[in-house]
């Protein structure tokens, strides 16, 4: 089983960050441009775990020795069911250097986007406040 899957299922978010390369790229289902860098991507994954309820991986496609994996998952957002797939690429050391996330159905994606944008804006504002306070 992919170490990323084990860490996400166990909600070991610090471990998730350790499994990312420094220059990891995240292709989000709600943003046109990809997010880059371990700190940014780990932070986004952390936010996602606060939005998706009853998150479970249902299927993993790809052999342990492969560099490409697909992790099919299900979750809830309030009373809406959401399904998705994490397409994970690992480098030669087994660290994740690219992650692409797909979600469906559209109504649940809109609910996810609404909640994610609010949490992301709050996180950016909190980070900006910390930076200003330290200068």
Language-model features: locations:
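C-terminal and inter-domain tail/linker signature
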Residues: 1-135
């Amino acid at each position: 089983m992919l170490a990323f899957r084990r860490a996400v299922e166990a909600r070991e978010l610090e471990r998730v960050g350790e499994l990312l390369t420094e220059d990891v790229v995240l292709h989000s289902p709600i943003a046109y441009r990809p997010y880059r860098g371990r700190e940014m991507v780990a932070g986004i994954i952390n936010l996602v775990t606060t939005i998706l309820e009853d998150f479970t991986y249902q299927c993993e496609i790809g052999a342990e020795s492969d560099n490409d994996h697909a992790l099919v998952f299900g979750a809830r957002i309030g009373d809406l069911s959401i399904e998705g797939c994490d397409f994970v690429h690992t480098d030669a050391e087994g660290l994740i250097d690219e992650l692409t996330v797909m979600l469906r159905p559209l109504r649940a994606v809109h609910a996810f986007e609404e909640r994610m944008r609010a949490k992301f804006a709050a996180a950016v504002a909190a980070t900006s406040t910390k930076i200003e306070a330290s200068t």
